[in-house]
Amino acid sequence: MKRSSELGFASSSLLLPEHGGTGEEFARSNRQQWLEYVNAEIARYKKNYNSIILVGHSMGSLLSFLTYMESPEQIIGIVAIDTPLYVRVKGRALRNNLKVGFCKEIPESDPAHALLKASSVAPCSILTYLSWAPRMIDLFCLMKKTREVLPQVSIPTLVFHADDDELVSASSVKCFERTIPEKYLQLVHLKESTHFFYGNADWDLLYYTFSHFLQSC
């Protein structure tokens, strides 16, 4: 957001319904609420801005594509970061989530610390985590729906993929290449990054490529 403001763009970050609070609150949400909220917010912005670029990370990328397909008017670009079109959960991801859920303190040097900082839901009990099962099903439904609509994308799309992602399968990259027309797709590999942590060189690459994309839309 800071970089987009520096380039003269107005920017806003959305907090999905029942995110930013407790695990119990998150368990009560659902994908329909998330989609309706994002659609409503983008519709509100369209009243004030002629051109909008959607930027999302992880599930936020899925919602960006689905929002664009719902109402493409005035949306001139999409930036998708670590998009889970397909999932491949590595052991490292399980360890990090267990640490976030059950360790009182996580040092900054621990890879789990990046997950803790990025999480929009507070750590909770194991029973509460189990109650999230319907939300995981919601995520897979969003993944499937996004894969289905990608061939209809007809605006510039910048995709970042962390090559060491512990959650997103490399098959997601192949899906982008197979479905989005080549003239609209720009794909960037972040070779030293994970789903929540970005190496210094990758930060520089992301910063430069994102800036150029905004200015070219």
Model-predicted regions and their roles:
Residues 79-89:
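Active-site nucleophile loop of the alpha/beta-hydrolase fold
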Residues 5-25:
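Conserved alpha/beta-hydrolase
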Residues 13, 174, 178-196:
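Catalytic histidine neighborhood in serine/cysteine hydrolases
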Residues 153, 159-161, 165:
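Short beta-strand/loop motif that positions the catalytic acidic residue
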Residues 1, 155, 169-178:
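Short alpha-helix in the alpha/beta-hydrolase fold that links the catalytic acid
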Residues 164-168, 197:
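Acidic catalytic loop of the alpha/beta-hydrolase fold
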